[in-house]
Amino acid sequence: MMAHENEEIIAKAQDFWTRYQKQITVVLAVVVLAVGGWYAYKNFIVKPNNEKSVDAMYKAEEYYRLDSLQKALNGDGINWGFVRVIKEYGGTDAGNLARLYAGDCYLRTGDFNNAVKQLKEYSTSDKLYQARAYKLLGDAYSELGKNDDAIEYYKKSANHFPEDLHNAAESLLFAALLSDRSGKTKEAIELFKEIKERFPNTQAANESDKYLAMHNIFN
């Protein structure tokens, strides 16, 4: 009985293969090509582009460290600046990092709209760098007079990577100060208190004491 059932199963399988052999072969070929294509793309396009973008950005980083911000952004006529690196290699890790550099350069040279554009397009899984980018966005929005957006990004920076005590405490302090300046006194007081609670041994906590005292709140 069991042998007969096995024969039926084998016969059905053979019949299925005979009827759908072409379709199955096509599907398997597509899968193989997709896997092979991704491997080729990763190893023959992405990897070389990453290496090229790092090389291309070297001089721009050097100008950035020297505070030659226009050359860092736009190059020197021979070497690329961050803007060109982003244009040519924006999809690489180095191209992504160039957005952070460019955003800071634009911010420091007073081009706040372009600073926002580059910083919003920057994204990384590195919490330290992402928190710094959020803080720079807060600075840019503050310069543009968009206080609500600035406060949002300052708080986002403080909460994204609180282990970076200086940056997190300072970001939250900026949010508190801007809230106070915007007439949001209650929110400002809560933020000053939060700074003292979360970051007690920082300069931001000392500054918070001063501003709370101005509101007749003493601890």
Model-derived features: where do they sit?
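N-terminal positive-inside, membrane-proximal cytosolic segments immediately preceding the first
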Residues: 1-32, 40
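Short solvent-exposed coil/turn linkers within tandem alpha-helical repeat scaffolds
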Residues: 47, 86-95, 109, 123-131, ...
